[in-house]
Every structure is written in structure tokens, then in C-alpha cells.
Amino acid sequence: MGGVSRIVAVLAWRNLWRNYRRTLIMLLAIGIGVWAMIFMSALMRGMTDQMVHNGLAVLPGEVQIHHPRYRSDPSVVNSMPSPTGELLAALEKPPVSAWAARVRVPAVIASERDSRGVTLLGVDPAAERALGSLPDEILQGRFLTDAADRGVVLGASLARKLDTELGKRVVIMSQDPDNNVADRGSRVVGIYRARLASNEEQFVYAGREVLQQMLTIGTAVSEVAVSANDYRQVDSWAPAIEDAAGDNLEVLTWMELDTFLSSMLSMQDGFTLI
């Protein structure tokens, strides 16, 4: 059998180079096809990765912690305590690179001309900056200086619809834990630009401590967002956060929070494997 195999190999080799132009054209076509597949796979992987990163900037974070009923009813009644003890220790331990606790509640914002329903975000700018979840661009003015900043930052689209501008005062209204209206006047200190106009219209930024005081919730927060700068490895470190959080809090990865992005990533991985 070994001799037959050698004879077949010699005949095949001679046949290939009997018409060397044909063979070179075939090899060139195969090479171009292989490199085209590699290029397309890399391009699609890059597009998928960018889509996931953009999605995590909106969520944000690879893991989020909430009160178990918060996602179905995002009111201050379903707030959670600020991280302490074991949970705080887990958040400060590698591979976690950044985390931020924020107040996130539905609200109404009113100017002299109009009013709109929005999502009010009470943030600590330093923590959000480390998490990479600040607005893409500040068009006018500035962002909040700290968690006690008494100004608000609006999206450009929202500012146009409210017919307000930098330096003007607006009123923000929401509900406290007793279902009473909680409101305060704030000055617009910044106007931001986001990738999507819908985000500009939805999110209004304020100081976390200012909102906690307005809503009379003490140091409670709506959610904690956590990042380790590697969304593909989230399953390796998320269980430690879940164990530290205990049974009274809900800990979800980005794949559970955004099933569309997770499906896109799985499809891309399958395409690359094939």
C-alpha cells in the first residue's frame, strides 16, 4: 500500500504541474478566498464587539445589582442599600476594575415652555468616569463635578424639545417612598451629545446625593453597575459578586440583561467557528 500511495502522489504532483498556469490560478483563487473569509470574519467580529461595547455603555457595566423587584417596577420603593461589608469587599477585589452606584428613577422634567417624561440618573461622576458610562460629548457647559453637584445635565435633543438652554432653571419631579411628589428646581449646567437621539431625550444626569436627599431615601441606590473590562469572561467572576450580594439582591450579567446582544455574540462566534 505504501508503494501505491507514493505512485499516486507522484502522478498527482505531475498532473498538477502539467498545466502550471491552471494550477497557479487555482492556488491564487483558493488563497484569495481564504483571506477574504478571514477578513470578513475579523470585520464582523469587530462590528459585533463594537456593538456590545456600545450596548454596555448604555446598560452600563457587565454586571448589575438591583433589588429583586426593581426591574419590573423601577421606583424608589425598590431601592437597595449602598454596598457594604462582603459586597463592598467583592467590588473592590480584582478582577473588578470599576463599579458605580446610582439612583435611577422615572421622572418628569419641566421648563418654562414644556415638560417631558425622562429617566433621572443620580450619579457620582468619578465612579461613572471609571466605568466609562459618561455621555459621549459635552456640547455646552460642563458635566457634574461630584455627587453633591446641584445642577443637571440634559441631552441636546431634550433641551431643544423643552426649549431650554444652558444656565436656565428646570424643575425635576418624581415620587418618594410614600408616593408623594418630590421635586426641586435645578440649573442646567451642561448639555451633552449621545450616539442616539433617543438617549439624549431619555437620560437626565444629576448628583446622586442631591437626588437621595430629594427622594428622602438616605444612602439607598437603585442599582450598582460593575465592570472588569472583559465582557467575554463575565461568567468567571460574576458568581463571586452574586455570593457576596446574598439572596436579598438580584445580580445579573449583561447577557441576561440584554439577550439581543448576547444572541448576536453567539451567532458571530458560531459563524467564526464554521
Named regions from a protein language model:
Residues 127-135:
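Cytochrome P450 core scaffold surrounding the K-helix E-X-X-R motif
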Residues 35-119, 142-148, 243, 247:
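Hydrophobic, regular-secondary-structure patches
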Residues 51, 87, 130, 236-237:
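Hydrophobic side chains in well-ordered alpha-helices
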Residues 176-272:
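Mechanotransmission and gating elements of multispan inner-membrane complexes involved in transport
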Residues 102-103, 114-123, 137-209:
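Hydrophobic secondary-structure segments that place a key small or acidic residue at a functional site
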